[in-house]
């Protein structure tokens, strides 16, 4: 289970409706997260942005 310093967030693809769920540390990462991950629908790597 996540501690109180970590927050469960979802990452939404910029090119499709694909989503990932992950955990981020609120103290160390104050801004919004952007990661390049594999999109299964498009079958290629795209940028995923943090969504609330």
UniProtKB/Swiss-Prot annotation:
GO terms for cellular component: cytosolic large ribosomal subunit. GO terms for biological process: translation. The keyword Ribosomal protein applies. GO terms for molecular function: structural constituent of ribosome. It holds the Pfam family Ribosomal_L33. Coiled coil: none annotated. The keyword Isomerase does not apply. It comes from the Bacteria. Keywords: Ribonucleoprotein, Ribosomal protein. Belongs to the bacterial ribosomal protein bL33 family. PANTHER family: 54S RIBOSOMAL PROTEIN L39, MITOCHONDRIAL, LARGE RIBOSOMAL SUBUNIT PROTEIN BL33M. HAMAP family: Ribosomal_bL33. This is Large ribosomal subunit protein bL33. It comes from Chlamydia trachomatis serovar D (strain ATCC VR-885 / DSM 19411 / UW-3/Cx). The lineage of its organism: Bacteria, Pseudomonadati, Chlamydiota, Chlamydiia, Chlamydiales.
């Amino acid at each position: 289970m996540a501690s109180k310093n970590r927050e469960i967030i979802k990452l939404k693809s910029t090119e499709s409706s694909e989503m990932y769920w992950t955990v981020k540390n609120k103290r160390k990462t104050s801004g919004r997260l952007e990661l390049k991950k594999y999109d299964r629908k498009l079958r290629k790597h795209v940028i995923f942005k943090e969504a609330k």
